[in-house]
Amino acid sequence: MNSSDLISVIIPVYNVEKYVGSCLESVCNQTYKNLDIIIVDDGSKDSSNKICEDYALKDSRIRIIHKNNAGLGLARNTGLEHVKGKYVAFIDSDDFVAANYIEAMLNGIKRSNADTCYAGYYEYYDDNNIISKPARYDSTIFTNNAIIEKVLLGMIGTEPSYKVDFILPMSVWHALYSSEIIQQHNIK
């Protein structure tokens, strides 16, 4: 693995004072260190911004962008406008990630010469219930029509009569993406 590959991590933040510290702690403590951490404060009215500012003072990899509240999608798009990394990951501010999260996905991309790598995840609930959501197609490479038939249709949805055996959660937060592909296709 080339440790010079900068990875941009976009973290939209809005009124998550209860969770954002754990999120930032998990990102700052990644085993892969060459990170460009972009926090987009989407007009938080609680102490989320102060918590983020405190982390930025301790970690020079963190940049904070302040904007008026416009929702999660626009906060992510604002982050995309500031990406410097070869790859980009999105992490929601009420989530935390395993210490090897970025490194494992980057290894997957490098091993397969891929543009995207998806990860499994766990869902944690306030009642201490934990549900494992493993990646369904470990080490599977999708190309050409398989991307449309297996990945996109599974994410977007299809007619009930159309059988899709690959279901990918409809969110960006469990993957690492090529920044070049995002920019080339103006994906926002």
Where are these regions (language model features)?
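N-proximal low-complexity "stem/linker" segments adjacent to membrane-targeting elements
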Residues: 1-29
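Short, conserved active-site loop motifs that form the nucleotide-linked donor/cofactor pocket
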Residues: 7, 35, 61-63, 114
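Acidic helix N-cap motif at the loop->helix transition within catalytic regions
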Residues: 21, 35, 46-54, 96, ...
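A conserved acidic beta->alpha catalytic loop
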Residues: 26, 41-50, 68-70
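Short beta-strand/loop segment that forms part of the nucleotide-sugar
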Residues: 35-43, 63-68, 92-93
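Glycine-rich, basic loop-to-helix element that forms the pyrophosphate-binding segment
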Residues: 67-83
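Short aromatic/hydrophobic "clamp" motif used to bind/position activated sugar donors
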Residues: 88
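Donor-binding/catalytic cores of nucleotide-activated saccharide
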Residues: 96-188
